[in-house]
């Protein structure tokens, strides 16, 4: 912090202090309603929701769903009335929470709820109850009836949070939906989105958006208009996953053998030496590896060597462009991506590991052939590459919400990015109790081996003293390596990583017990608190789960349909209220717990009351022991590139004012240290005669580590910002195409748009035929018209083109419009309008898919424009715009062509039910860049089957897209020498 910053802070106070000054009065005003709300009966409390909703609609003067939230004044109007209702509404939620869950919102939680409602990010430390905080903003905004989306990082948290908070919402008459595995476009899926609040993962929300923009019937859409989203672990979703696109794809035809052939030669290539500026030293090797940027590329010597090994004449020739791309991907697979760090191999499948959470990214695949290259490297079955049908990044998806907010324990270090990319301000919410955790200076050793030994000795001492410890690692590989060291030192410990993530909740529930040692990857129980002495609620819920296991088994075996249905209902009810039941027992409200069990016809739960009391009593005793021993000790085994991830690990300790301690054990051989000067420091230590086991500690060294992290964070921010600039080009095009699709889907009659397109196509074609001449060639016009099967002779064409170009455009437009209207009148208009819509949607979907592929190819090679002293981004925008306009031109020409030539067999349409393109075998996956799967033929056949029985003439029109796939009109391509 500079001198001016310090002066400014002293005069005006810190942002945190200023935020607290504004938010505190909101909490105080909420408190004034508490006594009044307490006196209400349950029914009166529920009726407050109806009262609030009436106030909202009266203020805005219309139904909320009629409000156009794209207009700033409407957004402001809605926000104003909700601000007015806020204190009383928050008091209502607080009372409902006390009555249903036994939890009362603290004043700081009320402040957090206000921040979320304001469309900002609430930074709240671990253990401050973010899940409960969300209920305040959710309820207030659910009063609009527009739907609130609560976005979580995984299915477990979505289900847990929804079930945990449902009793509160139910008491207040707010409906809750959970996005699980319900079938896309199903009535069940639509019913979930029609709920007042929907809990789900970022992937589920994003994929539903893409799927909704591939449907062929408006009835198949499941999402409503976007209104408000609250993103939990907002830094993880909006920053860590910002570069991750969601992609719906089908397979592309590729030669699998090529991956094996290229993989075979990679070990034969030698790494080149580089100077201090990462420039290759000529003649020293075949490829340059840049670990900082995670990049690798061939040297000139390497190019010649690969050409020789693969028997290719010119690696950069037109015929070999695919080969050089796959050679580069194979180099990355071998030299940049590491097993058990970036990915792991399980049951013959390559699974990506999230570098930020340590979890396996289920269903995700690297794109552009990288995943296939890794599969070849690991000698597992290679799956097909994919072709993109629809895609969007999380950055652009979440920016579509008129109102967006988020919560996390670590956002302040990324505040600049949140504001610049999403226009989201970060408010740091004070903790309910002061943080009592000690954050010690890093303990640094020369070698990795010395660090591990020192760490093991430290952990052994903690365990012997009955102190719980959480040890964080940055990868599965290090996690398993440290586990071996701990076993050698006879340290009892639990291992938590991507390979056994299913036990996460159970392991974290015990992580706060005396002497417990938990070795975890960066996931560190995100979303699951470590409670000192052990988590009695989690353990109590586990007891109820035992009942559910037996009941599910019984339901599975039950033959009587009636009994089976009753048992299934009972299981769902117990599952929904199990946590509320356990919390009631733990808080001493035994009668309330019994009442809850009896209400759900679950006497089996009552039988567990004594066991839950016993668990709670033991947890109390253990908690006192742990508190006396100094609380939870958190030990980091390596620094992450982002300070935020380190802070997340630290934040596991010292929750709710508990004592705790955090410290990092580092070595100069760690990746971050090695890449930012660790080798130089190591040489200094050797020169000073320091031994391998000696600890190195100095303020300047700690400062240099933080500076290294800042550099990496800054670079990653620049990369994300740069990628967004490119993606914004595609986003504008996507919005235009999806807007056209929506117009088609929601219009009963699209003839005005079709007539407009006929006029545009006619004008463009006549100008094309005439060139720069004043007159139009009647013969060319005749050929063009006959390609539409109009059946006009040359005399009629001569008459139509009399009077120059403008007159020709007018006459020919009228001629085509007359033919179009005549065609529509010859058959049932309703059938024709449906056929028309089907044809338009089919053309858009097919051409959009091709356009996405072309834009990917453009993006891949655009960087080379920099060598010609041109700005690649500017070039991408210009080229992308031209390509998009060309695609729209092709769509319009194809539409006119097909509409004018369509033949409908009578009585065929009503027997065919139009299907969604998504009923086929298309797969959707998110990826670290993309993914794979599906059946390309399936979607094409479904699009065709979606149309009525249509017969097309086989003649190729002059203005049709050339069948060769060039994207040019037929007359400018293979039709040049074939005037028809």
UniProtKB/Swiss-Prot annotation:
Membrane topology reported for the UniProt record: Peripheral membrane protein
One GO location term (cellular component): plasma membrane
Matching SMART domains: SecA_DEAD, SecA_PP_bind
EC number: 7.4.2.8
Location in the cell: Cell inner membrane; Cytoplasm
Co-factor note (free text): May bind 1 zinc ion per subunit.
UniProt entry tagged with the keyword Mitochondrion: no
InterPro entries, sorted: Helicase_ATP-bd, P-loop_NTPase, SEC_C_motif, SecA, SecA_DEAD, SecA_motor_DEAD, SecA_preprotein_X-link_dom, SecA_SF2_C
Keywords, sorted A to Z: ATP-binding, Cell inner membrane, Cell membrane, Cytoplasm, Membrane, Metal-binding, Nucleotide-binding, Protein transport, Translocase, Translocation, Transport, Zinc
PROSITE patterns on file: SECA_MOTOR_DEAD
A GO molecular function held by the record: metal ion binding
Binding locations of ATP: 109, 127-131, 529
Biotechnology (record note): Has shown promise in a 4-component vaccine with BHWA1_00430 (AC C0QY54), BHWA1_00569 (AC C0QYX7) and flaAL (AC C0QWY9).
Pfam family membership, one: SecA_DEAD
Signal peptide (UniProt feature, chain positions): none
Residues covered by region (Disordered): 954-980
Catalyzed reactions: ATP + H2O + cellular proteinSide 1 = ADP + phosphate + cellular proteinSide 2
Cofactor: Zn(2+)
Subunit relationships: Monomer and homodimer. Part of the essential Sec protein translocation apparatus which comprises SecA, SecYEG and auxiliary proteins SecDF. Other proteins may also be involved.
Similarity comment: family membership: Belongs to the SecA family.
Entry function: Part of the Sec protein translocase complex. Interacts with the SecYEG preprotein conducting channel. Has a central role in coupling the hydrolysis of ATP to the transfer of proteins into and across the cell membrane, serving as an ATP-driven molecular motor driving the stepwise translocation of polypeptide chains across the membrane.
Record's protein name: Protein translocase subunit SecA
Organism, as annotated: Brachyspira hyodysenteriae (strain ATCC 49526 / WA1)
Lineage: Bacteria, Pseudomonadati, Spirochaetota, Spirochaetia, Brachyspirales
């Amino acid at each position: 912090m500079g001198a001016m910053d310090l002066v400014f802070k002293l005069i005006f106070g810190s942002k945190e202090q200023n935020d607290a000054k504004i938010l505190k009065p909101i909490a105080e005003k909420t408190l004034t309603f508490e006594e009044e709300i307490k006196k209400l009966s349950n029914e009166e409390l529920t009726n407050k929701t109806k009262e609030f909703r009436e106030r909202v609609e009266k203020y805005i003067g219309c139904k909320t769903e009629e409000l156009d939230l794209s207009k700033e004044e409407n957004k402001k109007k809605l926000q104003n009335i909700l601000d007015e209702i806020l204190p009383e509404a928050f008091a209502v939620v607080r009372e409902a929470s006390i009555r249903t869950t036994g939890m009362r919102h603290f004043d700081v939680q009320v402040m957090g709820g206000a921040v979320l409602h304001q469309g900002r990010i609430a930074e709240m430390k671990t253990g401050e109850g973010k899940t409960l905080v969300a209920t305040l903003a959710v309820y207030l905004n659910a009063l609009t009836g527009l739907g609130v989306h609560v976005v979580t990082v995984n299915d477990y948290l979505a289900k847990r949070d929804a079930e945990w908070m449902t009793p509160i919402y139910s008491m207040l008459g707010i409906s809750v939906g959970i996005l699980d595995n319900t079938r896309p476009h199903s009535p069940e899926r639509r019913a979930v989105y029609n709920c007042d609040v929907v809990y789900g993962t970022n992937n589920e929300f994003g994929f539903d958006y893409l799927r909704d923009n591939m449907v062929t019937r408006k009835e198949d859409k499941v999402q409503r208009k976007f209104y408000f989203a609250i993103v939990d672990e907002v830094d993880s979703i909006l920053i860590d996953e910002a570069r991750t696109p969601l992609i719906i794809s089908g397979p592309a035809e590729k030669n699998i053998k090529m991956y094996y052939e290229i993989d075979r030669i990679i070990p034969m290539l030698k790494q080149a030496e580089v100077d201090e500026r990462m420039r290759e030293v000529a003649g020293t090797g075949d490829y340059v590896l840049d670990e900082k940027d995670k990049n690798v590329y061939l040297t000139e010597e390497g190019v010649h060597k690969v050409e020789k090994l693969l028997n290719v004449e010119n690696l950069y020739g037109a015929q070999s462009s695919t080969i050089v791309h796959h050679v580069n991907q194979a180099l990355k697979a071998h030299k940049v991506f590491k097993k058990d760090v970036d990915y792991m191999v399980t049951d013959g499948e390559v699974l990506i590991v999230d570098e930020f959470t340590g979890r396996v990214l289920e269903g995700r695949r690297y794109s552009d052939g990288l995943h296939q290259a890794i599969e070849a490297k690991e000698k597992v079955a290679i799956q097909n590459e994919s072709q993109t049908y629809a895609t969007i990044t999380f950055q652009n998806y979440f920016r579509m919400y008129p109102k967006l907010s988020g919560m996390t324990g670590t956002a302040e270090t990324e505040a600049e990015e949140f504001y610049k990319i999403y226009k989201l301000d970060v408010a740091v919410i004070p903790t309910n109790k002061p943080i009592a955790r000690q954050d010690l200076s890093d303990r640094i050793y020369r070698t990795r081996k010395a660090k591990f030994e020192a760490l093991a000795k430290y952990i052994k001492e903690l365990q012997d003293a009955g102190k719980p410890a959480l040890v964080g690692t940055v990868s599965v590989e290090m996690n398993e390596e440290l586990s071996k060291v701990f076993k050698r030192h006879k340290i009892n410990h639990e291992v938590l990583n991507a390979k056994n993530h299913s036990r996460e909740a159970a392991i974290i529930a015990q992580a706060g017990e005396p002497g417990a040692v938990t070795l975890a990857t960066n996931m560190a129980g995100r979303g699951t608190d470590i409670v000192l002495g052990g988590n009695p609620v989690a353990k109590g819920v586990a007891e109820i789960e035992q009942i559910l296991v037996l009941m599910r088994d019984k339901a599975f075996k039950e033959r009587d349909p009636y009994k089976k249905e009753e048992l299934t209902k009972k299981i769902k009810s117990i599952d929904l209220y199990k946590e509320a039941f356990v919390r009631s027992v733990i808080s001493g409200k035994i009668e309330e717990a019994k009442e809850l069990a009896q209400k759900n016809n679950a006497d089996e739960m009552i039988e567990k009351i004594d066991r839950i009391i016993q668990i709670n009593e033991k947890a109390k005793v253990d908690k006192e022991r742990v508190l006396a021993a100094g609380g939870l000790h958190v030990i980091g085994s390596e620094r992450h590139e982002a300070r935020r991830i380190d802070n997340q690990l630290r934040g596991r300790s010292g929750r709710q004012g508990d004592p705790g301690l955090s410290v990092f054990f580092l070595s100069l051989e760690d990746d971050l240290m090695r890449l930012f000067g660790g080798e130089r420091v190591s040489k200094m230590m050797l020169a000073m005669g320091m031994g391998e086991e000696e600890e190195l500690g100095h303020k300047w060294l700690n400062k240099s580590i933080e500076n290294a992290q800042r550099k990496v964070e800054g670079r990653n921010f620049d990369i994300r910002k740069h990628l967004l600039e490119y993606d914004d080009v595609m986003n504008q095009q996507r919005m235009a195409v999806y807007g056209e699709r929506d117009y088609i889907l929601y219009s009963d009659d699209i003839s005005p748009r079709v007539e407009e397109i006929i006029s545009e196509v006619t004008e463009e074609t006549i100008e094309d035929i005439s060139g720069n001449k004043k007159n139009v060639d009647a013969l060319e016009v005749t050929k063009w018209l006959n390609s539409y099967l109009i059946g006009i002779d040359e005399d009629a064409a001569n008459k139509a083109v009399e009077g120059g170009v403008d007159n020709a455009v007018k006459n020919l437009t009228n001629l085509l419009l007359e033919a179009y209207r005549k065609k529509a009148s010859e058959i049932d208009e309703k059938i024709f309008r449906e056929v028309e819509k089907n044809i338009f949607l089919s053309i858009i979907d097919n051409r959009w898919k091709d356009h996405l592929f072309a834009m990917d190819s453009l993006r891949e090679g655009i960087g080379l424009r920099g060598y010609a002293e041109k700005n690649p981004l500017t070039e991408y925008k210009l080229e992308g715009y031209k390509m998009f306009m060309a695609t729209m031109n092709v769509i319009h020409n194809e539409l006119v062509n097909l509409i004018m030539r369509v033949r409908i067999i009578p009585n065929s349409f009503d027997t065919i039910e139009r299907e969604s393109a998504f009923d086929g075998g298309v797969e959707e996956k998110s990826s670290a860049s993309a993914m794979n799967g599906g059946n390309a033929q399936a979607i094409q056949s479904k699009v065709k089957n979606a149309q009525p029985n249509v017969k097309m003439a086989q003649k190729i029109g002059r203005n049709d897209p050339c069948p060769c796939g060039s994207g040019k009109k037929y007359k400018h391509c293979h039709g040049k020498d074939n005037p028809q």
